[in-house]
Regions:
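Active-site charged/polar residues at nucleotide-handling catalytic sites that mediate phosphoryl
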Residues: 50, 83, 106
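Active-site proximal beta-strand in glycosyltransferases
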Residues: 3-5, 104-120
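N-terminal strand-loop element at the rim of the active site
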Residues: 5-68
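Proline-aspartate-enriched helix->loop->beta-strand connector
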Residues: 80, 84-86
Length: 139
């Protein structure tokens, strides 16, 4: 059996979009910890009900503040070293970037990214923030 850390952007997606995956992992006997930016009592109750631990993270999904991003990375490194997962699966852009970096820094060998859609970075807008983010994500 594996220990698995799932890192997502928002807690609701853990239930709505990844719920069946989490249930399947648990039914196969894997230890699963799920984390995302923010708290949601319904999601936490659902995850507890299927045997998944939930950790709320300090994630500002659309912020470009490097200090907040470093705090997010620091918390991910602490969580990854504490849980010592065999596998890390991250989805959404910031969790992928910082989650997989934290996993690598913590010595996790199996690191996986899941990016769906184009997201905020590629939405129609001419703002400087979006152009910078689009360039970074495309790199």
């Amino acid at each position: 059996m594996y220990s698995v850390l799932i890192i997502g952007g928002g807690p609701r997606t853990l239930m709505d979009l990844r719920g069946r995956l989490l249930e399947s992992m648990r039914s196969r006997g894997h230890d699963v910890v799920a984390c995302a930016g923010g708290e949601d009592d319904d999601v936490e109750a659902y995850l507890r009900g299927i045997g998944v631990d939930y950790v709320s993270l300090p994630l500002e999904r659309t912020s470009l503040n490097p200090i907040l991003d470093l705090l997010f990375l620091r918390r991910l490194v602490m969580l990854t070293r504490e849980f010592q997962p065999d596998v890390v699966l991250a989805y959404n852009v910031k969790p992928v970037i910082y989650g997989l970096l934290a996993a690598r820094m913590s010595g996790v060998q199996r690191r996986y990214a899941l990016i769906t859609g184009l997201g905020y970075a590629f939405s129609a807008s001419a703002s400087i923030k979006k152009r910078l983010l689009s360039g970074l994500v495309s790199y």
